Amino acid sequence: MPPKKAPAAPQSGKKTEQKKKEKIIEDKTFGLKNKKGAKQQKFIKNVIHQVKFGQQNPRLVAQAEGEKKTKKDDKKKELLELNDLFKPVVAAQKVSKGADPKSVVCAFYKQGQCTKGDKCKFSHDLSLERKCEKRSVYVDGRDEELEKDTMENWDEKKLEEVVNKKHGEAEKIKPKTQIVCKFFLEAIENNKYGWFWVCPGGGDMCMYRHALPPGFVLKKDKKKEEKDEEISLEDLIERERAGLGLNVTRITLESFLEWKKRKRQDRIVKLEEEMEKRKADFKAGKSLGISGREVFEFRPELINDDDEEADDTDYIFDKEDSDSETADDIKDIDLSRFVLKDVDETGITVASCERFSSYVISTEKDEEKLCVASGGEMENEDQSEEQQENDLENGFVDAVPVDENLFTGEDMDELEEELYTLDLEK
């Protein structure tokens, strides 16, 4: 028998190999991962590269990684180009103020590009678009309903109802007409027609048509056309000039001044006639359209009458207030009660007359005061006795006169003797 083959070593999986590599990296870089030095970081990169890629050239490895990145970027660019080519442009939706966004179908959802899902503020119900279609004023919606309403969808009750309507007496009396309902026209002219408009002539049972005939033009559209046809002022002037003809007078400065003078005179005459007419109306008692100024122009004597009437004004006062004020007794002063009597002046000090006299502050200049202080004479030195008495009565008091002989040589000798003979107290 041939010898048995040695059992093959079990092939290790990719995960186990990766774990082994990570363990080797941790052992070799123990305590160096948190180091911020450039050398330590470079050493860690080299260890990781050797363990993961073996003894490969680091340039080739970096080049391979760069190629992988460029391939990924190229794929993304291709996808973006395809989306730009085949994706239709969708403009941002705008909703009028006060409108509910849920009543508008999302434009991105219709193109299959909305990625918001339930968070989208617009509606994802495509049936809303059919419900929100504008009603055409040239099509009666009841005609479409009648076309769709066929016998295939009827039951017995519906069939009986249709027969009665079609061949009943009321249907026979009711005339067939192509006349447009007047309420329908008024609603369109006044911009009141819409989904919730109901015909006042019977609603859906109205016998008249709720559709405009082909070629019908509304009044508001006619007004717009008329406004567009209006010509400018320059064209109107040229048109009128062309219609005058050749037999007309040319405008010069003299003819223009004559025309202006004639017009002004006509205006003055017209104003005078109107004033006379107003005056006649005022005399007749018709003062409805006459102003206050015209009243005084027609009757100037009213101005003086108004001044005279202003003096004869009667003022109304309340008698009760005057009575309440004079309710207390008022007594007059009787001078006969005051009698002169002699008073005993013993023990009473009487003030001198000079005390009751008022001293008037003189407003002399400082130079005059200096002259008086230095012994100079006053200008009004020689005053009469009558003038001095008048000054005293009026409250003017002059300076006290100085006695020049008050301190003579004899008096000074007597004072010196008294000083020597004076006993000094110790």
Curated annotation (Swiss-Prot):
Residues 237-261 are annotated as: Required for interaction with DRG1. The keyword Nucleus applies. Protects drg1 from proteolytic degradation. This is Zinc finger CCCH domain-containing protein 15. Residues 219-283 form a coiled coil. Residues 1-28, 374-394 are annotated as: Disordered. Residues 14-28 have a biased composition (Basic and acidic residues). GO terms for molecular function: zinc ion binding. A zinc finger (C3H1-type) spans 100-127, 175-213. The gene is zc3h15. It comes from the Eukaryota.
